[in-house]
Amino acid sequence: MPMAQESMKFSLIRLNNFMRDRTLKGLEGTDLKASFTPVLAALGDTDGLTVSELSHITGLDKSNITRNIQQLSELGYIVKDSRNSPIILTRKGKDAADLIMKIQREAYDELISCLDDDERRMFIGVAAKVFRSIEGKGF
């Protein structure tokens, strides 16, 4: 693999690790696990989603979503009435989603603090293009 691709690969791994570590640190003292964060963050932006919708939005497979939903329900973060009904956050779940978004926003702000306004716009544009490409391939 050419050096530029290796460098990009390791940079992406480090970015992922940075976000994961900041999230874990922010969740200390709660009963939340890092695996809950994509589900809670996705639900925090909606009035409810189905398992299929959560799977599409988060990129997690349905069995992973189902496990997280079961645990989040047992902990009182979500309500799910029936198999095909939307999953809805409880007040506790909304508070958790707000906390997760705050943690991730602070981590993101720290990540891009070294960029000027033009570089930030470019970074966001390139990232959006990459993610659109990935989505088009079924990820």
What are these regions (language model features)?
Residues 18, 42-46, 126, 133:
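Short amphipathic alpha-helical elements of helix-turn-helix/winged-helix folds
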Residues 70-129:
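Charged, amphipathic alpha-helical coiled-coil/dimerization segments
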Residues 22-64, 71:
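N-terminal helix-turn-helix DNA-binding core of bacterial DNA-binding proteins
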Residues 121, 131-139:
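Short amphipathic alpha-helical interaction elements located at domain edges
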Residues 1-30, 77, 86:
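N-terminal leader segment of winged-helix/HTH proteins
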